[in-house]
């Protein structure tokens, strides 16, 4: 049995003021977030499940000694929320684990997140994330970012970037939207890259220079919008809508059901595997000529 420190508390509402209404195309003056947070299950099989994570949900348990210094509510840990929904948390706060985390999503980011449903499947996903190729169960993730306009947008529309120890493939849909695929992962990888390399900070990402939309950075305009898993010969693709209650920041980028517009959806569905493979070959050649950790761009 595991103890996560899950605490059940009565429902409540947090209110966040809109400070840039032109960025949301909304008539509202604030955004209301209801707690406990709701997490939608999108798909599952005998190996894994895909949930739609809302902003504010934590991918891991925080240090409670510091959490309550800045928060007046209990930490909404994603794993606790989905375990609670499955009815597996007992009165004493313990449970037999039903889900095993494969990867993480930053707290203010929304979208698809994969959990394995048994220890063996978790090991297979971890094996692929570590070694790549055909080893284990493969996981492909694409994110949509709504960004500020960049002076270099027309010069740098798509390609593979190795920077700060991580590799990312990206494509600009238009002046305000980027789609990015993680080839190798690192903390805050996309958020740093959009600001420091692409000159396109994400809306409301105050930590990395984004345009302020709300009076808090509880949510940024970054969404895990596409997940592809390959287990043996079985391939599953999932397009993930923006969760209900968190669509305001996206304005006209999404419809009333949280689905992205046709241009964004089209790019999300594109298979970049061949292109990324060719770019990685070019990257390997360039790496032999350049110093470690130097920015490398190939297309």
Curated annotation (Swiss-Prot):
Keyword annotations from UniProtKB, A to Z: Isomerase, Mitochondrion, rRNA processing
Family: Belongs to the pseudouridine synthase RluA family.
EC number: 5.4.99.43
Keyword S-adenosyl-L-methionine recorded: no
GO CC, any one term: mitochondrion
Keyword Isomerase: yes
Location of this chain's protein in the cell: Mitochondrion
Domain of life: Eukaryota
GO molecular function: 21S rRNA pseudouridine(2819) synthase activity; RNA binding
Catalytic center residues: 106
Pfam annotation, one family: PseudoU_synth_2
Function (record text): Pseudouridylate synthase responsible for the pseudouridine-2819 formation in mitochondrial 21S rRNA. May modulate the efficiency or the fidelity of the mitochondrial translation machinery.
Catalyzed chemical reaction(s): uridine(2819) in 21S rRNA = pseudouridine(2819) in 21S rRNA
Protein name, UniProt field: 21S rRNA pseudouridine(2819) synthase
Gene Ontology BP term (one): enzyme-directed rRNA pseudouridine synthesis
EC class (word): isomerase
Cross-referenced InterPro entries: PsdUridine_synth_cat_dom_sf (IPR020103), PsdUridine_synth_RsuA/RluA (IPR006145), RluA_PseudoU_synthase (IPR050188)
Record SUPFAM superfamilies: Pseudouridine synthase
